[in-house]
Amino acid sequence: MSKEDVIELEGTVIEALPNAMFQVQLDNGHKVLAHVSGKLRMNFIRILPGDRVVVQLSPYDLTRGRIVWRSK
């Protein structure tokens, strides 16, 4: 899967789950289960409930995603 195939959406972190997983409420109302991308993990970016994030979704499974950016 190339970078052009992913869908990027914004949302708000609702809940922090074990193993660096997060429940994210997207702006369109859907909830997805997302994990932290490698670059955010490598740079020790902390993600807390209430943070605005950008999530990449695969077109094959729209219920899981990857958090690639955190804003305040």
Curated annotation (Swiss-Prot):
This is Translation initiation factor IF-1. The lineage of its organism: Bacteria, Bacillati, Bacillota, Bacillota incertae sedis, Caldicellulosiruptorales. One of the essential components for the initiation of protein synthesis. Stabilizes the binding of IF-2 and IF-3 on the 30S subunit to which N-formylmethionyl-tRNA(fMet) subsequently binds. Helps modulate mRNA selection, yielding the 30S pre-initiation complex (PIC). Upon addition of the 50S ribosomal subunit IF-1, IF-2 and IF-3 are released leaving the mature 70S translation initiation complex. It comes from the Bacteria. Keywords: Cytoplasm, Initiation factor, Protein biosynthesis, RNA-binding, rRNA-binding. It holds the Pfam family eIF-1a. GO terms for molecular function: ribosome binding; rRNA binding; translation initiation factor activity. Residues 1-72 form the S1-like domain. The gene is infA.
